[in-house]
């Protein structure tokens, strides 16, 4: 049975290790190279395409960036590392490999890296450090940017794809940076000769989102809200004045303060013979972000 002294020794050792990790994050991350199989799996999951730029935060000897560029002539790369000696060696290796015109390595803290032009972000760092970088990635990387890690995850941000071979092989994960859907949006749809104004409100945590809308004095919840990079889709079933109980399926893309795409509407047809007959209409749809939240405007007792 463990004694109190042995238990305290374990606690002390764990505390010392945590302190070591914290100091390493503040000063430098000791370089431990990824094994070739993991590197290849990371690159395959990221699938960089011609014209894209990949960034490796904590690039070490450059092996992940090199693997992403080799055999892909249209891909450009950037490695960021806090170890000046490794940066110098990586730039020399890039020239020796004939990649000097497409890749560069810079001596920089990962928290200072410019992520705005990245299409792919690679990371293989301390798990705590990757978690600390998560807010920067979500705030600065473009929607749709692929983030690929080996071994460790990014906390509560659930991956969009996982390559897990089981056994002792580390899992490789990929995330798509989600567009910012959260907030208030307004749009209009023309149905049966009437203009219907939608005042919508979305809540979001990473790629998970939900929302509701108001049309006139009625409110309803959106169903099946999906955010994947810039792409967004959701559905709605709601009674609309002059149209009846209408089914709407929205598909579009979020670009800054606009959301644009198409909506498929299924509208009940006025028929004495078949009350299930529907008229199907597809139309363009454009929403704009707003600071005036119509969803909260007074409703009154007349909800027709």
Q: Where are the regions that the model predicts?
A:
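S-adenosyl-L-methionine
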Residues: 91-113
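Class I SAM-dependent transferase core
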Residues: 17-48
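C-terminal substrate-binding/active-site "lid" region of AdoMet-derived donor-dependent transferases
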Residues: 130-180
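N-terminal secretory signal peptides and thylakoid transit peptides that target proteins
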Residues: 1-15
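Conserved class I S-adenosyl-L-methionine
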Residues: 51-58
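Conserved SAM-binding motif I beta-strand of class I
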Residues: 76-81
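Glycine-rich SAM-binding Motif I of class I
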Residues: 62-66
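Central antiparallel beta-sheet cores of small beta-barrel/beta-sandwich binding domains
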Residues: 181-293, 299-303
